[in-house]
A protein has these predicted regions:
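Hydrophobic alpha-helical transmembrane segments
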Residues: 1-71, 112, 204-208, 213, ...
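Helix-loop interface residues and adjacent transmembrane-helix termini in multi-pass membrane transporters
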Residues: 13, 85, 154-155, 260
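Residues that define the loop-to-transmembrane-helix transition and helix capping
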Residues: 19, 89, 158-159, 264
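Residue-level recognition of pore/gate-forming positions within transmembrane alpha-helices
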Residues: 25-29, 98-99, 166-170, 222, ...
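Secretory targeting signals
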Residues: 29-36, 40-56, 98-165, 173-181
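Alpha-helical transmembrane segments of polytopic membrane proteins
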Residues: 51-54, 133-140, 186-196, 214-218, ...
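Helix-loop-helix units of permease transmembrane domains in multi-pass membrane transporters
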Residues: 68-98
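Transmembrane helix segments
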Residues: 158-256
Length: 290
């Protein structure tokens, strides 16, 4: 795993991609830091700088993660990885930790900015809150990296991986607004749950290579949804609202930096990270045995 980790870090900075992405995020942070924190004397680094750079992450992470596995498939070097004695989990973690190190570089500079505010008179409580916000920001980034790595494992085209990653993060970014639109009634929840059931059934059928299993999965999901709609429609609405809330990747960070320190928010980002790393391992395991 360590050899893969070193190889991935080296590849990020062998060309310009690592330097360009790091500079991109640093410039964005520096602009808000100088204009708001220093210009107006605002000690809240989490809200005025980190939160304002969230939109930049929609471009940063897809470009950072697009080549992690897509390039390996395109150059056929993934066959060497999959036939090596290294466990699939070790391959995934090696690449994941390498990308996390790349993302940590601008975060280290952000930490220096927080210390600068402290040196200029920010209180100890404000400084601790800023470091807590930076920790949450980093865990958010780790979750986004895990999502991007998973999407990269599904294709051999880096552009497709980047576009899919940007679309997924944009959807998560807009999800709070979409949640307000789609939780207006049980009929809307039923329709969207049915669409989700169709997607899951297609995935189940493709992974098992069984059309019958896909059809049975869809029929079972539709039957369960119909029963819920007729007998407990409120459960359907509440359940769909909970699903949409879980897809709001950036909303918990917004609440966190608004002086709402929350351990569940940190646990949420760790859970998303582990979940998508697990999905990536399963995808590579399937290809290894095929």
């Amino acid at each position: 795993m360590f050899a893969i980790f070193k190889r991935e870090v080296r590849s990020c900075f062998h060309g310009m991609i690592g330097y360009v992405l790091t500079a991109f995020l640093l410039v964005a942070s520096a602009i808000y830091f100088v204009a708001l924190n220093l210009g107006y004397g605002l000690p809240d680094f989490g809200y005025y700088t980190l939160y304002n750079t969230i939109f930049m992450l929609l471009f940063y992470f897809p470009v950072l993660t697009m080549r992690s596995f897509a390039e390996e498939r395109h150059t056929r070097t993934d066959q060497l990885l999959l036939t090596s004695p290294v466990p699939v989990a070790g391959i995934v973690l090696g690449k994941f930790f390498a990308l996390c190190v790349v993302f940590a570089l601008p975060c280290v500079v952000d930490a220096v900015m927080i210390l600068t505010l402290w040196a200029l008179g920010a209180t100890a409580a404000s400084t601790l809150a800023n470091f807590a916000a930076l920790l949450c920001y980093y865990l958010l980034g780790c979750a986004a990296i895990a999502i991007g790595v998973f999407l990269s494992s599904l294709t051999e085209n880096q552009i497709i991986a980047a576009v899919a990653g940007a679309a997924a993060l944009l959807l998560a970014y807009l999800m709070p607004s979409l949640r307000r639109m789609f939780t207006t009634g049980s009929a809307v929840a039923l329709a969207l749950f049915t669409a989700l059931a169709a997607v899951l059934s297609v995935v189940a059928g493709l992974r098992s290579r069984s059309f019958t299993l896909g059809c049975l999965t869809f029929a079972g999901c539709c039957a369960a949804l119909t029963v819920l709609f007729l007998l407990r429609s409120s459960w359907l609405t509440e359940g769909f609202s909970a699903v949409l809330s879980a897809l709001c990747l950036f909303a918990p960070f917004e609440e966190f930096v608004n002086n709402n320190f929350s351990i569940p928010t940190l646990v949420y980002y760790l859970t998303v990270t582990v979940l998508f790393l697990f999905f990536t391992v399963q995808e590579l395991e399937k290809r290894r045995w095929n």
